[in-house]
Amino acid sequence: MHLPNSQIYKNFGESMNPFDIMKASQIACCLEVSSFKPGNVHRNRDYRDIKYHHFINAGIAFGNVVYEAAQKDRDVGLYIKKAVIESKKWSPTNANLGIIMLHIPIAMAAGKLENFDENKLKENLKKIAENTTVEDALNVYDAINIAMAYVNKPKKGPDVTSEDAKKELIEKGLTLLDVYKISAEWDNISKEWVDNFKISFEGYNLLKKYYDELNNINLAVTKTFLNLLAKYPDTLIARKRGFETALKVSKMAEDVLNNFKEEKVKEFDKYLSKEGNKLNPGTTADLIASSLMIFILDRIDKRETILW
């Protein structure tokens, strides 16, 4: 007998339970990497040093930490570090540090909700950021080094690659939010923490809009990706190739979005990938993953978990 989703869910507990939050994170990771996002690894493209299946594996692997974090309201840095350790077991290089930095606080914030509520989720995220500690910052510095993430020497603030960085954090009493306020100048993941996940929620609302229009989650992700990339120059590209190059890529994304056709998207993808991953809009991909997690949490709450 076929039951509608609403009937199936009646036997389940509250929609914002830790298992659902874990599943939202894992499914978001899988949808993010599987959808066609120009310049990124996707189901039809690997990079030399990291392949499509590494992202799938790594995105699923830290689910147990998301489950734990969803039941906590402190130690966000510790759970980011634990998630990176789990993820790194399944990937030869950094697959999802940025995603983890976004998914763990979202999980903790969602864990305090009885039902999905965008405004309450924002309030909870704000509290998590404001209550971070020096210990959280120390753990995130460890996480970055474990992940072997691409980082430049910062213009100011402690250098995560320096042996004295953690000592400087302690001496100056810098919390994780303090550190993110410094790095927000050149990193949009850090800026999300400072701006209360503004881009992630913008992406969530774009996903809703495009999915309602297209009834195709992969196309909805592609259009959301292009929209965010057009509006917010990718900070990974900026760190690798300079801000002017990042601006140029954003302008190209806007042109593709305004003339949204399969061949245009593929041409853009070919252009961005012609130098390996030098023009990889990886920060924007991470923001898609956080937008997707929020989108899926909303769908779980509405008992609308089947996506086309």
Swiss-Prot record:
- The source organism is Methanocaldococcus jannaschii (strain ATCC 43067 / DSM 2661 / JAL-1 / JCM 10045 / NBRC 100440)
Lineage start? Archaea, Methanobacteriati, Methanobacteriota, Methanomada group, Methanococci
Q: Which GO terms describe its molecular function?
A: ATP binding; triphosphoribosyl-dephospho-CoA synthase activity
Name assigned to this protein: Uncharacterized protein MJ0227
